[in-house]
Amino acid sequence: MKSCLIVDDSKVVRMVARKILEGLNFDIDEAEDGQQALEVCQMAMPDCVLLDWNMPVMSGLEFLQQLRAMPDVKQPVVVFCTTENDMAHIQKAIEAGANEYIMKPFDSEILESKFIQVGLL
């Protein structure tokens, strides 16, 4: 079973994403901000991270930059899932090492399609 870390400061978004991904046979961990997510990645080493951009403590972009700079941590597939939909944000995400970018709100078909595209399904 593959594992996914859902990183979002919204409990509702985490709950919806968890339901979808558990339906696709993913084992789920959750974090409310980038700092918690780094800690989870160091311990659990997930196969993928579904990542929000705007969060307290540490943003999704800051998390991704720090994660990609950690050679001793398994490097998961990272899919941004955010309301930030302008090209500048998308470009920054890709440059930092994101594998895919999804706009909120999302549904199960979009999420499944993106996970297929990046080789998780």
Give the ranges of each region predicted by the language model.
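Conserved Asp/Asn-Gly motif in the active-site loop of CheY-like receiver
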Residues: 31-35, 90, 108
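Two-component/phosphorelay signaling modules centered on CheY-like receiver
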Residues: 11-29, 118
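Receiver (REC) domain active-site loop signature in two-component systems and cognate sites
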Residues: 55
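C-terminal output helix
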Residues: 106-115
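Acidic, metal-coordinating helix/loop segments flanking the phosphotransfer/catalytic sites
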Residues: 30-48
